[in-house]
Amino acid sequence: MIINNNISAINAQRTLKFRNVDLSKDMAALSSGMRINRAGDDASGLAVSEKMRTQIRGLRQAERNNSSGISFIQTTEGYLQESQDILQRIRELAVQSANGIYTDADRMLIQVEVSQLVDEVNRIASHAQFNTLNMLTGRFSNPNEGGAPVASMWFHIGANMDERRRVYIGTMTAAALGLQTAEGTGISISSIDKANSAIGIVDEALTKVSKQRSNLPAYQNRLELTAQGLMIAYENTAASESRIRDTDMAETSVKFAKDQILSQANLAMLAQANTMNQGALRLIQ
């Protein structure tokens, strides 16, 4: 009988130590709901999962960016609607003034309203903003169409680099629409001929505004389609990441119960092994 080294106790102690490590992992998985809580749990799985998490967070932010882009376009369209309504009224007054039954004094009264409406077109252009960004002053105009943009309006609508869309918004000031000279003089309807010319000027302005408004739905439709794709990609990527990283609660609960039983058995065997050497005392009594 050997008493200096209790091999049975050492074996039981070793087994108990590793069993407790398994219990600790089981409890971490059950409490967090994740199978991978540290790199040691599954190094390759963690690497893949982190890449997917990066993509998931990027997709969520891209979806928010997309929504902001739609809001920007809708806001711009609202301001252009106001400007177009004003232009329609100016044209109506020009047609009225071009009629020969009115005196010059009558036309001067009509001119007062026209001048006020031209000023309102300028006011809308200068005050149309989204997050303090001027929208209708040519800031985001298309250089290929004669614009001189001072900034670019990019909607980053993807989770990765270069997944973006540029939007152009033309200049909608009274001068850009031909309603006002560089010196600030507005169109005149003080005579029949001037009123007749004003009709053509306003028609050109309406065409320009209508063209810009017709471009906006194309931008918005694309963003709305992109939003659907982003949500589908987010859903599928999140599901894939979940399969890699999340724990199976039922399976882990069964394993936890098994490890608990084995740990308790190890404790009992360790206690039993520690009493085995007590028999040596009887030999020397």
Swiss-Prot record:
The keyword Cytoplasm does not apply. Pfam families: Flagellin_C (PF00700), Flagellin_N (PF00669). GO terms for cellular component: periplasmic flagellum. InterPro entries: Flagellin, Flagellin_C, Flagellin_C_sub2, Flagellin_N. It is found in: Periplasmic flagellum; Periplasm. Keywords: Bacterial flagellum, Periplasm. Its main location: periplasm. The flagellum consists of an outer layer composed of two sheath proteins, flaA1 (44 kDa) and flaA2 (35 kDa) around a core that contains three proteins flaB1 (37 kDa), flaB2 (34 kDa) and flaB3 (32 kDa). Belongs to the bacterial flagellin family. Component of the core of the flagella. This is Flagellar filament core protein flaB2.
